[in-house]
From Swiss-Prot:
Residues 58-95, 137-172, 172-204 form the EF-hand domain. It comes from Mus musculus (Mouse). This is Myosin light chain 3. InterPro entries: CALM/Myosin/TropC-like, EF-hand-dom_pair, EF_hand_dom. The modification Phosphotyrosine is found at residue 139. One of its GO terms (cellular component) is I band. Myosin is a hexamer of 2 heavy chains and 4 light chains. The gene is Myl3. GO terms for biological process: cardiac muscle contraction; regulation of striated muscle contraction; regulation of the force of heart contraction; ventricular cardiac muscle tissue morphogenesis. The lineage of its organism: Eukaryota, Metazoa, Chordata, Craniata, Vertebrata. The keyword Repeat applies. Keywords: Methylation, Motor protein, Muscle protein, Myosin, Phosphoprotein, Repeat.
Length: 204
């Protein structure tokens, strides 16, 4: 019967173990420190007051008529929801990405797309901005977008990383389209001067 006596000691050891357990509780406190938020790029905000309207009075009248076709307000308030903005832009011959539409809208929350309203005077500068960018592109926007990947801050990005960006983000390109754009752009280290690359794209 003597060999059974050590068993309570095992229980004692188990009982003692939890006393050491609270020590690791301090570990979770370190988690908030690793917040990558500051590294996200800051896009220039759309400022309607800086947009110069270059449309003719006749064009503006046509745009207004099209705008009013999307007016779903009960009393005909001559307004559309934020969520309809992209539809109206496309009805007027523009082809903005959803990201571009959200940008000119001030990046509203999902629930605001159906609740917030705008009148034609608010919409017109957005149309002017999208229309102008469709033809000329925005060199600064492209450069700013690629600068995020410039880890060394020396004006270059890795060719492999740029290929990934072109193939997966925004207006996705096929592998062949990416290779045509990248042809002759990489240096001996496999890096690309992104400002020169943007000029190359916009000139082609």
């Amino acid at each position: 019967m003597a060999p059974k006596k050590p068993e309570p000691k095992k229980d004692d050891a188990k009982a003692a173990a939890p006393k050491a357990a609270p020590a690791p509780a301090a570990a979770p406190a370190a988690a908030p420190a690793a917040a990558p938020e500051p590294e996200r790029p800051k896009e220039a905000e759309f400022d309607a007051s800086k947009i110069k309207i270059e449309f003719t009075p006749e064009q503006i009248e046509e745009f207004k008529e099209a705008f009013l076709l999307f007016d779903r307000t009960p009393k005909g308030e001559m307004k559309i929801t934020y969520g309809q903005c992209g539809d109206v832009l496309r009805a007027l011959g523009q082809n903005p990405t959803q990201a571009e539409v959200l940008r000119v809208l001030g990046k509203p929350k999902q629930e605001e797309l159906n609740s917030k309203m705008m009148d034609f005077e608010t919409f017109l500068p957005m149309l002017q901005h999208i229309s102008k960018n469709k033809d000329t592109g925005t060199y600064e926007d492209f450069v700013e977008g690629l600068r995020v990947f410039d880890k060394e801050g020396n004006g270059t990005v890795m060719g492999a990383e740029l290929r990934h960006v072109l193939a997966t983000l925004g207006e996705r390109l096929t592998e062949d389209e990416v290779e045509k754009l990248m042809a002759g752009q990489e240096d001996s280290n496999g890096c690309i001067n992104y400002e020169a690359f943007v000029k190359h794209i916009m000139a082609s």
